[in-house]
C-alpha cells in the first residue's frame, strides 16, 4: 500500500511540474508576442496592411473632390498618390477616408487614418493635438461676395451675415478677432457655398486659395477681400507622437521640394481652376519653412 501511495505522489508531482512548465512556456510565448507587437514599427504596420489610409475632402475642388466617375481628384490627391507610391510601391494602394473640416483631428486620434491631407492649415491649437510635417501650400483667410455688393473690408460686414464652414481657420479667426460679426455656420463646405449662392448670407470666409478657384468658376462673385490675418501654411498631419511616420514624411517632402513636385502639381490641378491671375509661387511651397 505504501508503494502505491509513493507512486501516486510521484505521478502527482510530475503532473504539477508539467503544468508549471506549460504555464511558463505560455507566458514566455505571450511575452515574446507582446514584445514583437510593441517593436513593430508604424511603417511596418502600414506595409503589412497594404494600403495607406488618407483623410481627404470630397467636395473641395480643386484640392480634394470626387469627379463624375466617382474617383478622387485634386492637388491633395496628387500628393497622396506620390506618398503611397514611394512608401508602398504603388500609387493606387490608398484608402481614401472622406472627412469634413471638424473631423480631421478626431480621425487621427482614433487611428482611423494614417495621414490627413485635407487642406489642413497649421495652427498652434491644432499642433497641440496632431503633428504636422513640412508644409506644401501657403494660404490666408479671404472673403468672397457678390460682385454687385462686394465686401472689401471687415468693417463692411457689420450688420451682415458671414458664412463659414465649421472647423475651419476662418471660423476661429472671426470668433476670436471679430466676435461682433454674425456667423452662419455649415458642416459641409459645399453647403456653405450653396448658402452663399442662395443669398442666405452676404459673404463667405474660407482659405483664399479655395475662394480664388470658386469665384473663377462662379460668375457673379469676387474675392474683394483676399487676405485677412497672417500667412498660414497647409501641411500633412499625423497622430500626435507618431514620430516615425512624421520623420518619413519630412524626408519625403524634402525630396519633393528638390523635384519642384508641388509646382508641377499646381500646374496640373490648380492652375486650370485659378486661371492666369494667380501664379504658382503665390500658393505652393517648395522649401522648408523655419
Q: What annotation goes with each model-predicted range?
A:
Residues 21-23, 31-32, 77-78, 82, ...:
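Extended ligand-binding regions for polar small-molecule ligands
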Residues 32-116:
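Extracytoplasmic small-molecule ligand-binding "clamshell" domains
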Residues 81, 93-156:
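Acidic, polar ligand-binding/catalytic clefts
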Residues 51-56, 73, 154-168:
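Short loop->beta-strand "edge-of-pocket" segments that line small-molecule binding or catalytic clefts
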Residues 16-19:
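C-terminal motif of bacterial Sec signal peptides marking the signal peptidase cleavage site
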Residues 39, 94-106, 149, 184-194, ...:
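Short helix-initiation/N-cap motifs at beta->coil->alpha
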Residues 103, 120-128, 173-176, 190, ...:
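A ligand-binding cleft/hinge motif common to bilobed small-molecule-binding domains
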Residues 58, 137-145, 208, 212-253, ...:
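Periplasmic-binding protein-like
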